[in-house]
Amino acid sequence: MKETIQGTGSWGPEPPGPGIPPAYSSPRRERLRWPPPPKPRLKSGGGFGPDPGSGTTVPARRLPVPRPSFDASASEEEEEEEEEEDEDEEEEVAAWRLPPRWSQLGTSQRPRPSRPTHRKTCSQRRRRAMRAFRMLLYSKSTSLTFHWKLWGRHRGRRRGLAHPKNHLSPQQGGATPQVPSPCCRFDSPRGPPPPRLGLLGALMAEDGVRGSPPVPSGPPMEEDGLRWTPKSPLDPDSGLLSCTLPNGFGGQSGPEGERSLAPPDASILISNVCSIGDHVAQELFQGSDLGMAEEAERPGEKAGQHSPLREEHVTCVQSILDEFLQTYGSLIPLSTDEVVEKLEDIFQQEFSTPSRKGLVLQLIQSYQRMPGNAMVRGFRVAYKRHVLTMDDLGTLYGQNWLNDQVMNMYGDLVMDTVPEKVHFFNSFFYDKLRTKGYDGVKRWTKNVDIFNKELLLIPIHLEVHWSLISVDVRRRTITYFDSQRTLNRRCPKHIAKYLQAEAVKKDRLDFHQGWKGYFKMNVARQNNDSDCGAFVLQYCKHLALSQPFSFTQQDMPKLRRQIYKELCHCKLTV
């Protein structure tokens, strides 16, 4: 039988006072084979617990009263584990700086200890972070922010922010302060990036549905000392959808802060759509009959005014926009009439009514505002030696100024449409001719005889304005086209001198004399300072195809979209 030794430290346990129940150490299981008794070792900082056979009672254990530490039936491994626990406990006592006879002090007499050491708090942070990370990797959550809640707390503590959940302190009795955590708000920017929503999801985001907190499900939860009991989805008072959406997310609240019921045909999923409110679903889908109570709540709406679009129409619109985005790299050349025409061809129905056309326009605008749908980065159009990027094609949007890349590639498309008739000069030709004379551009036409063509097109770019020189070779006329109707007499003179020098070099003396210059005044005039490049491209196209100038300033938005498509297809629409 092993002899037990009990220390006589001043901080050891004393017999419990009146009203405190005795606490006994849990007995350990007996081993069949007794190991040889090791030499007893005294622990630093105190003695051993009482002998189980002595009949003494052990007071109730409170932090940091040491536990009974020796048992004859314990093995060496258990003793080592016990020593490690006691060492951790001693570190905890040292960290808290507890005075002697701490357990016998009253609650009101206990002084407030200092904050624990940094090592223990770091270990707690690491454990919390690893737990959240494992939950993020290996579990499927039914909430949008459940995993990131723990992770957000960990990040906030690492950054030194105030955390409402304090450590267990003897002064507070281990109670958790009931203060909402600032690091776990649903609108916190430290949360996960929102999923890429589909077309209906973008509509929900516009109506404020996406910003509402997710609906938790499951048993009652307690967080920060507050008890919260969720309502059942089947409860009519809860206002939640009675079915789980395909992506596993719960329904969300409407813009008024109340849970809204969606009609049966509105709970569809296109691209991670979380939920659909009743007001949006009524605008998008037909056949959703509102009850008398809902109609009474909405006296401003006309009776029987339902949505003219169904879910298959919305799905078709999204597929059309996806295909358009992949073909043209952006939705710049897209018009609502084009989408309406495709819908009419597919469904054999009329979509040109104001109500349906307005909803199609709303779908297009919502699709454009979705992340990643503005343009396709890396989209390029290559034709011969020309390469157009999205930055070049973006000059055709709105009232942007066209650059030289767009001008030169479109001119080559015009020239290749009627190659035997037209020759198009580069946009840098006139600038080089004006600064360096004929010697600077004499090699530009070494492989072509311009006097065998019928029409020469020379774009002129002076400062920030585009204009055009058109040369009728047979009639020996030089015509200046300017959408702002400015009279630039130097341009025709420079071109006339170039033609005379080229005639001498190519030995075409019949074209050396007889050139006349004109200014074309009865042409379409621009009303702004940004559409001069688009006017020049239309001048080139109509002159090459021998078409009259039937366009005006009001046609420029449509013509810009047409030029964009022609550049992407590398072919003019004749």
Curated annotation (Swiss-Prot):
EC number in record: 3.4.22.-
Localization of this protein: Nucleus, Nucleolus; Nucleus, Nucleoplasm; Cytoplasm
GO biological process, one term: negative regulation of double-strand break repair via homologous recombination
Residues carrying Phosphoserine: 54, 73, 75, 169, 181, 188, 212, 232
Active site (UniProt): 465, 482, 532 (nucleophile)
KW Nucleus (keyword) present: yes
Composition bias type Acidic residues, residue spans: 74-93
Principal EC category: hydrolase
Its biological purpose: Protease that releases SUMO2 and SUMO3 monomers from sumoylated substrates, but has only weak activity against SUMO1 conjugates. Deconjugates SUMO2 from MEF2D, which increases its transcriptional activation capability. Deconjugates SUMO2 and SUMO3 from CDCA8. Redox sensor that, when redistributed into nucleoplasm, can act as an effector to enhance HIF1A transcriptional activity by desumoylating EP300. Required for rRNA processing through deconjugation of SUMO2 and SUMO3 from nucleophosmin, NPM1. Plays a role in the regulation of sumoylation status of ZNF148.
Compositional bias ranges of the Basic residues kind: 112-125
Family: Belongs to the peptidase C48 family.
Protein name stated in the entry: Sentrin-specific protease 3
Keyword terms, alphabetized: Cytoplasm, Hydrolase, Nucleus, Phosphoprotein, Protease, Thiol protease, Ubl conjugation pathway
Domain of life per record: Eukaryota
Signal peptide (residue range): none
One Pfam entry name: Peptidase_C48
PROSITE patterns documented for this protein: ULP_PROTEASE
Gene: SENP3
Region (Protease) residue spans: 386-543
